[in-house]
């Protein structure tokens, strides 16, 4: 038989889907080990300090009682921060910063949707721009705040 490789939908670079990785609601695979490996490869090649300027996951969030219980985002964040710390402390990669993509919910550049939410702050607007525009801290807000305050402690 012929080998079939399924495409990893949504990822910036099209490639084979890893059957062992979980995916977001939009098909982006969640791969903290891949981030660590990438940091090592880039640092090994260029030998300059690295700064991660965009990392995050889009998800469908539900506002309940003026917050979002986004444990899936917290897990993603903790796994990726742990991988970065391992790259720094165990692999000696010089990575001096990490910034989440979209700290507040914004319209997705890739899909034009508001329902694809990245932020730690929920914005009460739908895909058509209807809603109050009010902002609500998600559960992940406090986790990210603590990570910043403690320089990466999780």
Language model feature labels by segment:
Residues 1-154:
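Non-catalytic scaffold segments within catalytic domains of secreted glycoside hydrolases
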